[in-house]
Amino acid sequence: MLAGTFDAFIYESIAGRRNLRGANCWDIGAHVGYHSLIFAGLGAQVLAIEPNQYNADRLRAHLERNPALARNIRLLAVAVSDQDGEMSFVQSGDMRGDSSGSHLAAALAPLDPLVYAGCERLMVPTVRMDTLIERGERAPDLIKLDVEGAELLALRGGRKLLAEKKPLLLIEMHHICLMFHLQQLLLQLGYTLRLLDEQNAIPSRCFVIASAD
């Protein structure tokens, strides 16, 4: 990650599809800001969305250390879902942001429930993607979605945005059942999907790029 080559296949998949200079990117499940900083470095305006308080704090620290890039990044400390309000969130106090295992309790989390037995539960604010647009956010040209099993919840809350604006989607899918349901939803919305980094895909996780080009 420090070398800047982590998840390099994501950026290779974008090449030729989107010029990010001047583009608007939503980094949903921004973690500590790795992808947000890269998007900003490529010239994009970035809305970084991260509900985990430890991750969000580290993201803020990274923005302070990178003021030139930080000018193009805004942090929104909420979870994206299919409803506006609050939802239960599973978060490990021991991780302090080192892991991306936190998730909405309603999500199809990728790991065995026992793995999360020691995690804390708290209520976090939630927002639909469509609501963000209604509140005046500029529609994204690209959405990176990595929400640990809440992918379907997030996309259901953005049906209008996806149907009308057709942003390019980079999705990390986290549950084998979600892979089926997400494909159904995106096909209905006019998207085609392509598997990325297939050699490293596992039954509980894979990466796809979805476009309506």
Regions found by a protein language model. Name each.
Residues 1-12, 76-135:
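Glycine-rich adenosyl-binding loop in Rossmann-like folds that engage adenosine-containing cofactors
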Residues 1-72, 114-123, 133-137, 204-213:
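S-adenosyl-L-methionine
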Residues 30-32, 53, 82, 147-149, ...:
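Short, glycine/acidic-enriched loop or turn micro-motifs at the edges of active sites
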Residues 36, 42-48, 131-213:
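Conserved acidic-Pro-Pro-aromatic motif
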Residues 64-67, 90-95, 185-190:
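Short, hinge-like loop/turn segments at secondary-structure boundaries
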Residues 74-76, 194:
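General small-molecule cofactor/ligand-binding pocket signal
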